[in-house]
């Protein structure tokens, strides 16, 4: 009987990774998923490990035995730079330090299209994590663009749902790099292929959609598809910077963190589009159709 390949997944309870794991043949793969909280998680064939990426003692034995590691755990929004580097960079380094030198597993790292020196603390922390990953024998780095189609109202998904009913919409002015949004199902397919179908190793995949939008172009497209008037209010960079400073001082969450300004205005990579099965305009059209039918 062929031994199952052992797979260790961080950030396993995220919507993205749950969809990846749903595609895996658990007759062939023995999967352990690391999660901050395993409440209400019930996926057949998956061993859930409650723990923290920063505490390697909690998951050491599973990493040592692994043939494949998918690292998706990350912090994306924080008021302090230290949080980004503790989780995204140092957490990745601690995970890698657990790997057996004899086993040499495939390491698939879910990074970000904004990874870079000019992309604020988040972007730099992801870039430093990538550098750690690329020291390994077998690795794939995946840099997703803006992902839509999930159930959480955040990022571009929040922008879509805020704008789809029309009204006044705030729009950052002067952002040069366009968004190239990609549907969650297409993102899932690429991650699955990288980990379980053994695509070319030791490569960085910039994962983006085929159509680019500035923030203003996105709002105008939503207006056209929805048929609802949108009043666009341009917000200059200096004002966003001020909001970032204020957000750091306030004790409550205002939905904006200091490093988002640098992240927003940084130059981002773009490559030939991945296979796209759901275009953004069609996706928005379906939302509008459901609203009208409801």
List each model region and its residues.
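NAD(P)H-binding glycine-rich loop region in Rossmannoid oxidoreductase-like domains
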Residues: 40-42, 46-93, 98-101, 113-117
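Conserved beta-loop-beta element that borders a ligand/cofactor-binding pocket
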Residues: 130-151
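A conserved pocket-lining segment of Rossmann-fold NAD(P)-dependent short-chain dehydrogenase/reductase
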Residues: 161-182, 190, 194, 206
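Mid/C-terminal beta-alpha module of Rossmann-like enzyme folds, strongest
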Residues: 190-253, 275-294
């Amino acid at each position: 009987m062929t031994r199952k390949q052992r797979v260790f997944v961080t950030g396993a309870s995220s919507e993205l990774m749950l969809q990846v794991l749903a595609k895996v043949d658990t007759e062939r793969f023995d999967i352990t998923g690391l999660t901050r909280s395993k409440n209400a998680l019930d996926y057949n064939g998956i061993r859930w490990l409650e723990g923290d990426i920063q505490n390697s003692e909690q998951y050491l034995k599973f990493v040592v035995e692994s043939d494949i590691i998918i690292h998706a755990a990350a912090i994306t929004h924080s008021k302090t730079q230290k949080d980004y580097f503790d989780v995204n960079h140092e957490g990745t380094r601690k995970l890698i330090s657990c790997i057996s030198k004899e086993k040499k597993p495939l390491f698939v790292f879910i990074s970000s299209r904004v990874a870079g020196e000019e992309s604020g603390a988040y972007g730099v922390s992801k870039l430093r994590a990538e550098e750690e990953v690329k020291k390994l024998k077998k690795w794939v780095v995946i840099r997703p663009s803006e992902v839509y189609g999930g159930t959480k109202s955040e990022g571009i998904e929040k922008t879509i749902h805020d704008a789809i009913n029309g009204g006044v919409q705030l729009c950052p002015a002067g952002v040069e790099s366009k968004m190239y949004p990609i549907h969650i199902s297409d993102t899932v397919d690429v991650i699955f292929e990288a980990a379980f179908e053994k695509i070319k190793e030791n490569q960085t995949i910039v994962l983006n959609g085929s159509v680019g939008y500035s923030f203003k172009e996105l709002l105008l497209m939503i207006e056209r598809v929805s048929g609802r008037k949108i009043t666009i209010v341009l917000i200059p960079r200096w004002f966003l910077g001020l909001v970032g400073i204020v957000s750091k001082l306030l004790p409550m969450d205002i939905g904006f963190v200091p490093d988002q300004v640098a992240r927003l205005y940084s130059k981002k990579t773009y490559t030939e589009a991945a296979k796209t099965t759901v275009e953004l305009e069609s996706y928005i059209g379906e939302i509008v159709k459901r609203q009208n039918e409801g």
